[in-house]
Amino acid sequence: MQRTKEAMKASDGSLLGDPGRIPLSKREGIKWQRPRFTRQALMRCCLIKWILSSAAPQGSDSSDSELELSTVRHQPEGLDQLQAQTKFTKKELQSLYRGFKNECPTGLVDEDTFKLIYSQFFPQGDATTYAHFLFNAFDADGNGAIHFEDFVVGLSILLRGTVHEKLKWAFNLYDINKDGYITKEEMLAIMKSIYDMMGRHTYPILREDAPLEHVERFFQKMDRNQDGVVTIDEFLETCQKDENIMSSMQLFENVI
């Protein structure tokens, strides 16, 4: 039961909480707030847990440390270059690559594999759609595969990035068609995918209209000029003035 309750918390860059947990009749007059991330919820982030679980040293040689394994079909960028691109230390990059290589010997993660990973962490629901959206957010060049470089750059932003960088990453996740705007349709698709991932056995039971209500609250807060879309400027300005979001972003720092 405790795990089910904890699974309700947002993760993987999601800034949205769950309005479905409080009956509508009791929410009147209550100021809407996004829940803060907990360290426990963050450490259950599928990507982090998946990689770190395989990152323990297993007698690897120096070639592992230098990210130059001839058996890997996709060779990642050099260690120095990745260290310059991210906010990870050399030792952290070596550990992350060891875990990535153990799980993905080819050096690539395709979308089907990514969905399988998420399905294992959310067996009570359907994580397929949310995994699709998250995969596209990590697949920076849109080539249908997540390279180690894609993984560590995204992870660096989520764990060590500035608030501005994290918010831009979150906006990119919500902007499904990457046209620079978040529409109600896009946000509803994201919210439905999150609720589907939670499953039907959560407690308290989620109401059917919770995703739509969440979207309406999101746009009331974010759509400053009420033109039906949320721009990156509106998103950044509103979020950076929200103490709840600012506090939640700090929990991404120094986790690894």
Swiss-Prot record:
Signal sequence bounds: none
Origin species: Rattus norvegicus
Cross-link (Glycyl lysine isopeptide (Lys-Gly) (interchain with G-Cter in SUMO1)) at residue(s): K26, K90
EF-hand domain span: 67-123, 126-161, 162-197, 210-245
Region (Disordered): 1-22
Quaternary structure and interacting proteins, as annotated: Binds to DNA as a homomultimer. Dimerization is induced by binding to calcium. Interacts with the C-terminus of PSEN1 and PSEN2 and with PSEN2 CTF subunit. Associates with KCN1. Component of heteromultimeric potassium channels. Identified in potassium channel complexes containing KCND1, KCND2, KCND3, KCNIP1, KCNIP2, KCNIP3, KCNIP4, DPP6 and DPP10. Interacts with KCND2 and KCND3.
Any one GO biological process: response to pain
This protein's encoding gene: Kcnip3
Official protein name in the record: Calsenilin
Cysteines paired by S-S bonds: none
Annotated binding of Ca(2+) 1, by residue: D175, N177, D179, Y181, E186
Expressed in which tissues: Detected in brain cortex, thalamus, dentate gyrus and cerebellum (at protein level). Expressed in brain. Colocalizes with KCND2 in excitatory neurons including cortical and hippocampal CA1 pyramidal cells.
Annotated region described as Interaction with KCND2, given as residue ranges: 243-256
Family, similarity comment: Belongs to the recoverin family.
Parts forming coiled coils: none
Lipid addition sites, S-palmitoyl cysteine: C45, C46
InterPro entries in the record: EF-hand-dom_pair, EF_Hand_1_Ca_BS, EF_hand_dom, Recoverin
A GO-annotated cellular component: dendrite
Description of post-translational modifications: Palmitoylated. Palmitoylation enhances association with the plasma membrane. Proteolytically cleaved by caspase-3.
Binding residue positions for Ca(2+) 2: D223, N225, D227, E234
